[in-house]
C-alpha cells in the first residue's frame, strides 16, 4: 500500500480565473497516473498550500492578485528546490520567460494551452518527480540497511 501512495503526485493549480483552473484540471484528468489536485486563486494562497501539503508539481499563471506566478515560483523554489513548476501564461514577453528560467521553472507554456504540448510537459515533469521519489526511497532503504 505504501508503494501505491508513493506513485500519487500532488499537483497544485494556481490561477485567478476558475475556468482556467477547471481547464487544467480537465487536461490533467486525461493523463495517466494518479494525482491529488489542489487549487489556489493567487500566489499567496498557493504558497500556504505548498508549505502545508507535500506539493511536487505546480501549474501556475503569471498575472494574479496578491502575488504573481513569478514571485510564487521564486519563493517556492527557495523553500523547495526540487519542486517542479510549469508556468502557463498569455504573455509572450521574453522577459517573463527569462525571469522564470532564472527562478528554476521547469517549463513556460503560452496560453491557449495545446493539449499535446500539455501532455509532453506533464510527462516530463512527472518523470523527474518519479525519479526523485525512487532515489529517495533507495537512500532511505540504504540508511535502514546500515
Please tell me what each predicted stretch does.
Residues 6-10, 17-38:
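Two-component/phosphorelay signaling modules centered on CheY-like receiver
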Residues 15, 61:
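Active-site residues of response regulator receiver
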Residues 39-48, 69:
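Helix N-cap/capping motif at the beta->alpha junctions
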Residues 48, 70-81:
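Short amphipathic alpha-helix used as the core "switch/output" element in two-component signaling
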Residues 64:
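Receiver (REC) domain active-site loop signature in two-component systems and cognate sites
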Residues 71, 92-107:
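Alpha4 helix (beta4-alpha4-beta5 surface) of REC/receiver domains from two-component response regulators
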Residues 101, 107, 113-146:
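Interdomain helical linkers/hinges and coiled-coil/dimerization scaffolds
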